[in-house]
Every structure is written in C-alpha cells, then in structure tokens.
C-alpha cells in the first residue's frame, strides 16, 4: 500500500530501542545513561516517578549524558521490588509475628554487616573488578532461592513465593551477565534467604558470625533491609563512629546476634518455645543499645548469659538505662504520714513521678494531667503553711493511697460459707454503742488525725485525750470518701445479717444470694479504701426483715386492751417511718448522694432500735414506753417510682359548674370529657374520653389514662413546650341528637421540665369567652425532664425513750432516803449532800440506760463502774426529789439559786470548750445548760 519514505535508521538502532523497551537488560554503567531522544522527555519521567511514588523534582536537573546518582537508582530499585499486594495483605503485627521472616532478616542482617566493613573507607561505592568467585556465589544464592520458592509454594504463602520469585529472576539475569564477563556489583545480588534446609543454615551462620560490631544497633524490622545502602553511605562518610570491638556496645551487639542465631537454629529444629524465648531475649537488648548509642549510663550487671549458658528459667530482662524516669511502675504505699503536711507532700511526689513517667513514654496528655494535679497539691501545701484550712476532699488521691484522714482497716475476708456466717453472727450480735460509749472506749484502727487538727497523733497510737476530744476524733468522718466507706461497710453488714437470718430459717438459697451480694461489695470496699470513687447506685438495696416491726410475743395477763392497742399504734407508726427512710435512702442512692443516703440510713436504724425497745417492754408486760413527737425537716426527692420513664398519667378529676346548653337545667346535664395529646404527631395523636356522668353540672370523673411518651424525643419536648393537652367538655346527645361541645380547656405541660406533677384547675372557654366552668386535671411522670425535684418536708417524727434491757437492781432506794426532821426544813439545816439539777440527772440516767441496753444487746457484760454510776444517779435523783418534796419553800429557793449557779457554770464551760475547738464537748455543755434553764423557768412559774 503506502511505503514509508524517510532516512534509513543507522545500524545498531534496533538494539538501543529494544533496551529502552526493556527487552534487553544491560547492567553496565553505560546502559544507565539517559539518552537525548524523546525517551528523556520530562513529562514521561514525571509520570513514571509519580507511578512509583517518587518526586519528579529530583530528576529535573539531570540533563545531558551524566549518570544518575546511586541513591536515585537504589530508590527506584527498591520501589520496583516492593509488592503492593503484600503491603495490603499483611500488617506490621503479622510481619513481626512471622518467625520465618525474622530468621531471614537476621541472616540478611549478618550479610550486610559483612558488606559494611570493607566499604567504610570509601565515600561512594564503585563497581568491583571481575571476580571468579561471583559466579559461585550467584549459583549458591540461586539454589537457595529455588528451595525457598518451593518451600513457599508448599506452605501456600503467595507473598513469599512472589518475593522469592523476583529474587530468583534477578539472580538468573546476573548469572547470565557474569558468564558473559560483565562486571557484577555485589550490592545488586539478592541477599540469602532461609530455605529451611540444613546446608543453608550452616552457610548463613558462617556469614552472620563474620562481623559482630555494626555501626548502628540493628532492630528486627523489615525497613532495615531496605535502608542498608543509606546506612552504608553514612558509615563510609563517618568512619570514626565505629565502636571498639571490646566496647559495651560491641559486646551487646555480639550477644544479641548470638541469641538471634540460636533462635533461628531452634526454629529449624522445631523447638518453637526455645526459639520464641531466644527471640524475646534478643529483642530486650534493643532499648539498651539505643541508650548506649545516646551516650547514657547502663547497668550491665544484669545481662543474660550467652545462649548456651542460659538457665531453663525465664531470663531476666535486660538492663535498663539509668534515667530519671526509670522508676517502678507500681509504687509502694509509703509509711503513714505524721501530719497533714507530710501526707500532702507524699501524694504530690507520687503525682510528680507519674508525670515524669508519662513524659518518658511520650504520653503528653497524661503528663499534663499529672502536672495539673501537682499544682493543686502545691497550692494546698502553700495554704497549709500559711495557716489556712485545706479541703483535702477536693484533692485527687493517687492509686494505692488511703484518704489523708485514714480509714478503718478492712475486716478479713471469709472464704467459706461457714466462715461468712460466723462473721455475720458476730455482726448481728454487735450493735453500735451510743455516742457516750465512743467517748470512753476509743475504736481500734481508727486514725485520730483530722483536717481541723493536723498535728494530732497518727492512727497507730490510741487517743489519750479527754472523752469529748476522743468523740470529736472518732466523728471525723465528714469527707465523702469516709462516708462512702462507712456506707459500704454498713450495707455489707446488713447483707450478712440477712444471710444469717435466712440460714436460721433453713432458706439456703436466700442465704447464698445475700452472701454473693456481700462478696460483690468487696471490690467496691477495696477501691474505697484506696481513695477511689465508687458508684453507689450499683450497691444492692438493704434487705428488709418483716419480723422487725411485728410484735410476735403475746401480752402478759396483766396488760389491758388499751395498752395493747397503744402498742399496735406505735408499731404502725414506726413501720411507716422505717419504710419512708428506706424509700428516700434508695432514691438518694440511685442519685449517688452519699450524705443524704447515710442520713436516712441512720434514721432507719433509729426506728429499728425504737422498735426493739417497744418489743422488750411488750414482752415484759410493761406500760408503753415514754414516746413523744418531734418536728423533723427533710430534703427529699419527689418521684413516682410506680411509673416507668415512658409513662405519663393523666387524671381527670372533676368538673365544677360546667356550662349547660340553652334550654337545659344544670340537673339535666350529661357531661363527659375527651382529650387530645398531639404526640408523637398530630396525625397519630393520643385520644380518649371519660365515662358519662349524668344529671349534674359538677361531675366527679376520677379517671386516669396512661399515655406513652419518649423523654429524649425532640417531638415530645416540642409537644409539652408549645401544645400541651386539649380538653373538650361535651354534653351527651339523645337518640336522634348529636353530642354538643360545651367548652374547651388547654393544659400547658412546660412545668414538667422541673416538676414531675402538674395539678391545675382549668377554666372552660367557649372560643375565647369564659363560661364560668372549671375542670380539675392532673398529670404525672416518673421524674422531671431536666433536673431532680427537691422538696423540703416537715414530718411529725415518733421518738421512743430507750429503757435498759436489764436494769441493775437497786435494793430499797426509798429506805436509804433519810427523812428530814421538822427542824431541818429551815435553810441551812438540811443534809450536807450537794444538790443537782433533776433534769441533768435524768439526762445522765437516760444516757447510762442506753449504754447498758447496748451492752446487753451485744451480749457483753456490764462493767461494774457503769452499773455503780447508774445506781448512784438513781439514788441521788430519788433522794433529791424526796428532799424537795419535804424541804419547803426555803429549800426550793436554795435549789433555784443552785440552778442559777449551774446555769452560769455550763454557759462558761460551753464558751471555753468552743474556743478550744472541742465542738462535741461544747455541744454537750450547751445541752446541759438548756436543761438547767428550762428547769429553772418551770421552778419560777
């Protein structure tokens, strides 16, 4: 057809074109020259480098026939050798977990070390002269790669097979070029691989042990193999960095290499456990080598021995560099502090160390957090040194440190059912004593230090101060952490008591359940003792014993029916108070309010003690104990627990003076109410109606409707804020008459944001015109939508005076009262026995009775001094009453003046104790002063 006319191509042009197309491979330096024809187009070069991931700017300056730099050639070779599928298939974790690849890298590492040493004096590597040993080396590598390809094919590892196949093709090309007499650069020869056969192992061992002192510490990462040329260039540029063969760095590198070779040998012997052990030991050298390369000090006394001398036990970790951050990760709890300042300094130092550790690990966020806490402690220490009060409850507590005030030691945990039940028996028989018992008998293992008295003795020494000071120290549990611990211990005690009761009733399943709940509290108790916050909402509720508020004994024959009825009324009131306390305690527990929870727990315990007193008096056929009502004010949460979060109750109570249609009288009105709540939308609004109430204009419907809501739904919020509930008052029609709407009313529900109940009396409108009628409605939800509804209520609280279980017998107290003769009724002639306030004597008598009752309930003997005190108080009170009855007006005047002196004495004592900081003792003195003042006023009237 058409012939191509043009100059004939010069001879040899076809071979050049074939080389450019990649058909002929020429590794000579002349073959790497960039020709000046169209192949050297900058656009093609940029496109090629963009495809292989390079930077086009690196080759823009290369013009003419100058050779490419070796760095660019090596980079292009590495990019071409990289397998994209392999990068996608495996991850760093898979590569590191592949023991075959690690062994291969170790052999490569040994071969590179051999190649680095002769290249150190030169600046740029030059092609070596023809060497007859190159062909033998290529033949050996060819056999190794053929075996490796076959092994990878049998193992089904496609990534390794492709990698070895590329190396095999490169070796074949190099071998052909070597046979033609071309110069072969040793750096172009693929490295040896682990073929899994004996000769290959011995060969690699001879190569890897030829050099043990590389310039930089090798790491078992695949990137080391790729960066070997740059490492060689850096080494040749700075030969003075080579370590001394006898230096610690060379010694560690040699020992690490021995462990790697031993791991490879153990792996090929199918001893994977030993291979993994040697590999772990070799990896433990990496941080030490890095520390030595940075010039840090290293303790080499704990280095593991060579592999052949390693004991069968797990090896010790390699020595760590001596740096400021090399501290124990798990700090020990320091000695108990002597004062508040030392406690603050200990905790500040712990957070300072934690900040240093976080910085050393590179965790800047945690380091900044610990530094902020250190600043808080520094401010607290400065405030304490300046004499200002320090709120230690606001300071974070380090893990493992108890709160600064100290906590009671934990009871030993019981591991068996019998042991737990024995502990529960002891706890059930042991009741808390009164406050006065705490004054005289200090608790064991209770610290005496408090924030108000930082210079008090530590918890190891028992308090030796007066009774009020001991009481104040024992009540230093005002912090949240201590309240939390006391609450958890009390709940565990209640659960153990419930388990004991269930076991006594042969309810094994119930006993096991309560024991499991008690054991489940131990992690919370441990965390609370260490100063960590716990979620008390997850604490199981207190078990309730129904028999606690039941009079099980029968009354004696001498008890009247009126007394039995009064006992029943008191029991009912105490049961109601106890249930109310438990309900409020549960609500505050779910909210995490530990202070209010403990408050209602104590009130519930008081109700139980009052019930115990009532039971004892009932069993002994005594008259009802002295009972009184007190006004108690509580802050409670208003909630309707019988409703779920998705329920809303609508109450239509009644209508008041509803309008009547024209021509009908109010007695002819048959009314009902229908409502419309536009949620979830107007089309699917919730609608219903009441029943018809006939013949009245003030019907009482008293009906309730349960509506479905979603508290978090935006449509529900929009419905209660803008729409509400629409009501229609309707007159029921007759047989051929339709229903007639008398008026409408609208209830707004925006109050539910902050309240759980809306109670309104709505005005019935005819359009916009008032009709004079009213409609009473009410809406309830479980709890408010945005915040808790706190209410302050005042209750009439029943308090029963405690009586001792077994009062020490006072033989003939009236016989010991000396009768006052007639002549002694005058002032100054009475007995020399001192007078005391009868109210104060009654207070002391009641206090001693409570103490004796507590001892009896705990099945402990009454101390003789306590019994003697009680007997003395009873005798003094009876004697003084007889004196006042027989003494006349003169003795009463003297008694009044004596009360005035006691009033002044207690006033001064309360003021002095308040200045001294003894708050509890000052409160007691003030209470006695009020008793004397009340008695003096009654006496004057």
Swiss-Prot record:
Q: Which residues form a coiled coil?
A: 338-384, 475-508
Where is this gene product found?
Answer: Cytoplasm; Nucleus; Cytoplasm, Cytoskeleton, Microtubule organizing center, Centrosome
Superkingdom of the organism of origin: Eukaryota
| Residues found modified as Phosphoserine | 247, 434
Which terms under GO biological process does the entry name?
Answer: apical dendrite arborization; dendrite arborization; endosome organization; negative regulation of snRNA transcription by RNA polymerase II; negative regulation of transcription by RNA polymerase II; regulation of postsynapse assembly; regulation of respiratory gaseous exchange; regulation of respiratory gaseous exchange by nervous system process
Q: In which tissues is it expressed?
A: Strongly expressed in several brain areas including frontal cortex, cortex, mesencephalon, hippocampus, midbrain and hypothalamus. Also expressed in testis and at low levels in pituitary, liver and kidney. In brain the highest levels are detected in hippocampal pyramidal cells and raphe nuclei.
Classify the main location: cytoplasm
Compositional bias annotation for Low complexity: 467-476
Phosphothreonine is carried by which residues?
91
Q: Where is this region: Disordered?
A: 183-248, 301-336, 428-482
As one GO molecular function, the record gives:
DNA-binding transcription repressor activity, RNA polymerase II-specific
List, alphabetically, the SMART domains matched. Answer: C2 (SM00239), DM14 (SM00685)
Q: Where is the C2 domain?
A: 628-762
Q: From start to end residue, where is composition biased (Pro residues)? A: 303-318
InterPro entries assigned: C2_dom (IPR000008), C2_domain_sf (IPR035892), C2_Freud (IPR037772), CC2D1A/B (IPR039725), CC2D1A/B_DM14 (IPR006608)
Record carries keyword Transferase: no
Q: Any one cellular component term from GO for this entry?
A: glutamatergic synapse
Compositional bias ranges of the Polar residues kind: 228-239
Q: Which family does it belong to?
A: Belongs to the CC2D1 family.
What job does the chain carry out? Transcription factor that binds specifically to the DRE (dual repressor element) and represses 5-HT1A gene transcription though this element. Mediates HDAC-independent repression of HTR1A promoter. CAMK2G inhibits CC2D1a-induced repression of the HTR1A. May play a role in the altered regulation of 5-HT1A receptors associated with anxiety and major depression. Performs essential function in controlling functional maturation of synapses.
Domain comment? Answer: The C2 domain is required for the repression.
Q: What is this protein called?
A: Coiled-coil and C2 domain-containing protein 1A
């Amino acid at each position: 057809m058409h012939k191509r006319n043009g100059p004939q191509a010069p001879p040899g042009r076809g071979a050049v074109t074939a080389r450019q197309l990649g058909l002929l491979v020429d590794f000579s330096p002349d073959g790497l020259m960039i020709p000046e024809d169209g192949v050297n187009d900058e656009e093609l070069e940029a496109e090629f480098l963009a495809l292989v991931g390079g930077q086009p700017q690196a080759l823009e300056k290369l013009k003419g026939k100058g050779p490419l730099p070796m760095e660019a050639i090596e980079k292009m070779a590495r990019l071409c050798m990289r397998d994209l599928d392999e990068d996608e298939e495996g991850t760093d974790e898979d590569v590191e977990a592949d023991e075959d690849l690690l062994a291969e890298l170790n052999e490569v590492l040994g071969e590179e070390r051999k190649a680095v040493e002769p290249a150190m004096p030169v600046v740029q590597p030059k092609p070596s002269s023809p060497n007859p040993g190159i062909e033998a080396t290529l033949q050996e590598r060819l056999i190794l790669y053929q075996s490796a390809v076959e092994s990878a094919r049998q193992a089904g590892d496609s990534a390794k097979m492709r990698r070895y196949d590329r190396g095999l093709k490169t070796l074949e090309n190099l071998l052909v070029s070597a046979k033609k007499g071309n110069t072969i650069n040793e750096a172009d020869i693929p490295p040896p691989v682990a073929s899994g056969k004996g000769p290959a192992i011995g060969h690699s061992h001879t190569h890897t042990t030829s050099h043990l002192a590389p310039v930089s510490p090798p790491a078992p990462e695949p990137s080391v193999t790729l960066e070997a040329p740059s490492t060689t260039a850096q080494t040749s540029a700075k030969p003075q960095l080579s370590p001394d063969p006898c230096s610690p760095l060379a010694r560690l590198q040699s020992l690490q290499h021995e462990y790697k070779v031993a791991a490879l040998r153990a792996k090929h012997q199918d001893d994977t456990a030993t291979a993994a052990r040697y590999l772990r030991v070799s990896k433990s050298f990496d941080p030490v080598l890095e520390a030595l390369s940075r010039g840090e000090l290293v303790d080499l006394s704990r280095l593991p021995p060579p592999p052949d001398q390693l004991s069968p036990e797990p090896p010790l970790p390699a020595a760590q560099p001596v740096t400021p951050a090399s501290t124990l990760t798990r700090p020990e709890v320091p000695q108990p502090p002597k004062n508040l300042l030392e406690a603050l300094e200990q905790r500040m130092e712990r957070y300072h160390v934690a900040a240093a550790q976080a910085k050393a690990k590179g965790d800047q966020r945690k380091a900044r957090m610990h530094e902020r806490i250190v600043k808080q402690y520094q401010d607290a220490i400065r405030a304490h040194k300046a004499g200002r009060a320090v709120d230690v409850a606001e300071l974070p507590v380090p893990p493992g440190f108890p709160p600064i005030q100290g906590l009671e030691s934990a009871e030993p945990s019981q591991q068996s059912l019998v042991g737990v039940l024995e502990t529960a028996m002891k706890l059930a028989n042991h009741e808390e004593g009164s406050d006065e018992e705490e004054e005289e008998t200090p608790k064991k293992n209770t610290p005496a230090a408090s924030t108000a008295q930082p210079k008090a003795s530590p918890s190891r020494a028992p308090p030796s101060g007066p009774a009020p000071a001991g009481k104040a120290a024992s009540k230093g549990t005002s912090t949240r952490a201590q309240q939390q611990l006391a609450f958890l211990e009390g709940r565990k005690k209640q659960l153990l008591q419930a388990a004991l009761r269930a076991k006594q009733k042969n309810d094994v399943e119930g006993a096991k359940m309560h024991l499991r709940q008690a054991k489940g509290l131990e992690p919370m108790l441990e965390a609370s003792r260490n100063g960590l916050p716990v979620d008390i909402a997850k604490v199981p509720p207190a078990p309730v014993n129904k028999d606690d508020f039941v009079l099980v004994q029968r009354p004696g024959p001498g008890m009247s029916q009126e007394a039995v009825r009064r006992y029943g009324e008191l029991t009912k009131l105490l049961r109601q108070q106890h249930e109310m306390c438990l309900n409020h305690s549960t609500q505050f527990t779910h909210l995490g309010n530990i202070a209010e929870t403990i408050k209602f727990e104590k009130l519930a315990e008081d109700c139980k003690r009052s019930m115990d007193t009532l039971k004892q008096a009932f069993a002994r056929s005594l008259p009802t104990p002295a009972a009184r009502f007190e006004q108690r004010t509580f802050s409670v949460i208003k909630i309707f627990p019988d409703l779920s979060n998705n329920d809303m109750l609508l109450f239509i109570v009644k209508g008041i003076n509803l309008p009547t249609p024209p021509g009908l009288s109010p007695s002819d009105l048959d009314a009902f109410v229908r409502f419309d709540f536009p949620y979830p939308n107007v089309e699917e609004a919730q609608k219903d109606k009441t029943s018809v109430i006939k013949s009245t204009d003030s019907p009482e419907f008293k009906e309730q409707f349960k509506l479905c809501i979603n508290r978090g739904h935006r449509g529900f919020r929009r419905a209660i804020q803008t729409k509400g509930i629409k009501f229609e008052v309707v007159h029921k029609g007759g047989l051929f008459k339709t229903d007639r709407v008398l008026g409408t009313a609208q209830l707004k529900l925006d109050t539910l944001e902050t309240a759980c109940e809306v109670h309104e009396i709505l005005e019935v409108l005819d359009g916009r015109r008032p009709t004079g009628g009213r409609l009473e409605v009410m809406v309830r939800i479980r709890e408010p939508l945005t915040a808790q509804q706190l209410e302050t209520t005042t209750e009439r609280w029943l308090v029963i005076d405690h009586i001792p279980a077994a009062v020490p017998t006072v033989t003939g107290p009236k016989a010991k009262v000396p009768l006052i003769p007639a002549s002694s009724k005058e002032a100054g002639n009475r007995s020399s026995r001192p007078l005391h306030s009868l109210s104060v004597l009654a207070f002391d008598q009641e206090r001693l009775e409570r103490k004796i009752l507590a001892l009896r309930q705990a099945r402990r003997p009454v101390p003789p001094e306590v019994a003697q005190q009680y007997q003395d108080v009873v005798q003094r009170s009876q004697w003084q009453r007889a004196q006042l009855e027989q003494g006349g007006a003169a003795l009463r005047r003297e008694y009044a003046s004596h009360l005035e002196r006691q009033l002044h004495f207690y006033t001064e004592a309360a003021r002095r104790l308040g200045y001294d900081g003894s708050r509890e003792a000052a409160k007691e003195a003030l209470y006695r002063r009020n008793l004397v003042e009340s008695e003096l006023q009654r006496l004057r009237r």
